[in-house]
Amino acid sequence: MAYTVEAAFNTLHENINLSGDHRDTANKRRDRIVELLKNQFTILEAFSAGSIPKYTALRGHADLDVIVALHYGKHVKDKLPSVVLQTVRDALGAYRTGARTNGQAVTLYYDTWPNVDIVPVSRVTDNNDTVTHYEVPNSRTETWIPSRPKDHAALIEEASKKCGHNFRRIIKMVKEWNRVHGDYLTGYHIEVLALKAFSSDLDDLPWQIFMFFDHAQKLVKERLWHQVSYVDDYLSVSSRAEAVKRLETAYTKSLSAWYATHGANKDHATAIGLWPIHLRKITRHSNQRTAAKSP
């Protein structure tokens, strides 16, 4: 049976997609964390964030963030980010915790999936006491990073409605590509790249994945501003160069792969072998499963 690029992409998405609605789990974990912290902190607000509630999560590599807005005067003022993070970790001393590699959260480990990254933040308000953004701790640089996680999540939802279901599919496929090609880009960075790249209906998945790499290879070369901060400040000079090199290779391969099945061209085998998102591996596994079922 012939295997097409469309079928390969569908199989890939099935393999990497975290299916189902996990908001109930996220909300329960959020409420439990507030319960654990409220005796030692004045918590002004807490909400779930990360790839799970945005439906951009990879199966087996999903993250759940719980943003906890602490009273600035009591818990944040005149304190280094590392100190604030440590006080949260100390408050959870009876539980197994760790520090997230980017230095912006305390990880609380659960017996069941998912673990939770607790991000203690302070709120910044205007003269009308309206929250303009949040300040996220970065213990690696001892700085506070401006962030608007709610607005970013809303932008993802708006883009998904405007561009169609392929918008989130592309994000997840690129996250998987990134994961197996050095993991140089954060998931948040990839989401922002998708927001910058797409603004209309995505009805041709192979072409639009090629276009993502076309946009991304250019955008990652320079600093990228989104909302209230640069999304790529975590990249060193060498890491940026490596990320760009991989994106340029993906761009070149994607163009050739797309052309192999464009118009009258029907060379699906060549296209599947060229696509940088490991479609050949997907088809090999699929064929093995089919063969195993044969008498």
Enumerate the language-model features and the residues they cover.
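RecA-like P-loop NTPase motor core of helicase/translocase proteins
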Residues: 11-15, 39-42, 73-77, 91-94, ...
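Conserved nucleotidyltransferase catalytic core and NTase-mimicking acidic/glycine-rich helix/loop elements
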Residues: 162-285
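Generic non-transmembrane alpha-helical segments
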Residues: 32-41, 87-95, 173, 177, ...
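Extracellular/secreted glycoprotein ectodomains characterized by long, lumenal stretches
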Residues: 47, 53-59, 70-74, 84-85, ...
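Short beta-strand
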Residues: 46, 50, 97-101, 187
